[in-house]
Swiss-Prot record:
Cytoplasmic side: 23-34
Protein name as catalogued: Photosystem II reaction center protein Y
Family: Belongs to the PsbY family.
Gene Ontology cellular component annotations, sorted alphabetically: photosystem II; plasma membrane-derived thylakoid membrane
Membrane-topology annotation of the record: Single-pass membrane protein
Subunit structure: PSII is composed of 1 copy each of membrane proteins PsbA, PsbB, PsbC, PsbD, PsbE, PsbF, PsbH, PsbI, PsbJ, PsbK, PsbL, PsbM, PsbT, PsbX, PsbY, PsbZ, Psb30/Ycf12, peripheral proteins PsbO, CyanoQ (PsbQ), PsbU, PsbV and a large number of cofactors. It forms dimeric complexes. This protein is only loosely associated with PSII, and is not often found in crystals.
The species this protein was found in: Thermostichus vulcanus
Length: 34
């Protein structure tokens, strides 16, 4: 159903944007722990 894609696309874009912003911080935290 194309409506599922219409709903999922912005959700995936937002998730990808959030991951891209959070990832460097998360990596820094992990390196601090190790």
């Amino acid at each position: 159903d194309w409506r599922v894609l219409v709903v999922l696309l912005p959700v995936l874009l937002a998730a990808g944007w959030a991951v891209r912003n959070i990832l460097p911080y998360a990596v820094k935290q992990v390196q601090k722990l190790l």
